[in-house]
Amino acid sequence: MQDENLTTAQRIAEAITERIVSGALPPDAPLRQDHVAREFGSSHVPVREAFRQLEALYLVVAAPRRGVRVAPLDAKSTKEIVEMRVALEVIALRNAAPRYTPTHLAAIELALIEADNAETISEFETANRAFHRALVTPCAMPRLLASLDGLRLANSRLVLAMARNAGWRPRTNQDHRLILQALRERQIGHACDLLTRHNQTIERLARPGGA
């Protein structure tokens, strides 16, 4: 029964994650255990576990008397997401890059190409997350990688929200190419600097006027 609850919780968490990231569930939207349990035909136990998973991914917040709600996307939240991701992804990259094999570099390049070939913002953002995950996976630091998975999903919410407001068109990501080039040349410090600058872009774009 415990394994069944965990499987159901994962299914619920994945479905709600997609709704939050896509914007179908807007910031501060309430999530009620009884409603979610009824929708998925489950007890409250896997719903509570799903909510814990979503909170660990920075997608929902739980507060006394307010219950569980979709995490906000205000300036303060954006700054927090960006600063955490900037710091943690560089730590992961510094530990991952010395372990790269040709297979790792090929995976990074494949994600880059898929992002370049994306025809929709959803396709682009899926490939973008794959690129950033491929950069750091060899670091072999599971807790750090789990935190970064959540931060990338939170970042995707920002990207998709901005795309809905400002529109999106296919483009080549020059930052990604420069990062990959530096890594191929074993210029790890330079790659980390490029990654920091690249990850900070989202906060600048989220400011009024994109300044």
Pin down the residues of each PLM region.
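Hydrophobic, amphipathic alpha-helical faces that serve as interaction scaffolds
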Residues: 84-100, 129-166, 201-205
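Alpha-helix C-terminal capping/termination sites
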Residues: 98, 120, 184-185
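C-terminal all-alpha effector/ligand-binding and dimerization domain
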Residues: 112-113, 153, 160-211
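Amphipathic alpha-helical repeat elements characteristic of tetratricopeptide repeat
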Residues: 10, 14, 86, 102, ...
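Hydrophobic side-chain positions on well-ordered alpha-helices
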Residues: 19, 115-118, 136, 182, ...
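Hydrophobic packing residues in well-ordered alpha-helices of helical domains and bundles
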Residues: 81, 105-108, 124, 128, ...
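Short linear motifs at protein or domain termini
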Residues: 1-98, 207-211
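Amphipathic alpha-helical segments enriched in hydrophobic/aromatic residues interleaved with Lys/Arg
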Residues: 105-119
